[in-house]
Amino acid sequence: IRRQRQMCIRDSWDDVIQKISPLASKDSLYLAAETEPDTYKNEKMYSDHPAVMGAIGLFPYNSHQIDFAKMKKTEQWIWKNWKWETSWGWDYPMMAMGAARMGEPENAVGALLMKQQKNTYLVSGHNYQDGRLRLYLPGNGGYLMAVAMMCAGWDGSIHPNPGFPQDGNWDVKWEGLNPLF
């Protein structure tokens, strides 16, 4: 990002970045954490945030740290098996951003429109969670970020409106947005 913005390069930062370990995986699926080898066998691990999708949805794609085929397989497992009723409002935008970066705009839109209680938006703009938690801003902010990314793209995206299906059914208009890093 610093190179793209023509800012000074800090060699010490690049050195640290190159030494970051690749994401932990097992059986060609990325794990929730290196200490959780049973991520996809322990229901507790796939009943909260599908946070592993943040590695490709929220951060710049880096092939040194992320194997695209492995991430795609992980994403497919998550779509098929996740306990969505226990997830949180920001999980849906995070899934949308990951799907968009992986060239799956139908899944990106599907994540934002998934019919789940915690993927509901109130008139106030807040993301409804449950009766005890009436205000929840991470879902709202995530939704705005996901839609902006789906419209303006990200560094390296080449198609207009890359997060929306290019099947002729979408007429997406926007202005003033910048690509995500």
Walk through the language-model features, giving the residues of each.
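Single conserved hydrophobic/aromatic residue that forms the stacking wall/gate
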Residues: I1-I9
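Non-catalytic carbohydrate-binding regions of carbohydrate-active enzymes
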Residues: W13-E43, S63-F181
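Start-of-helix signal in alpha-solenoid helical-repeat scaffolds, especially tetratricopeptide repeats
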Residues: D48-H49, G89
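Active-site cores of enzymes that catalyze phosphoryl transfer or operate on phosphate-rich substrates
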Residues: V52-L58
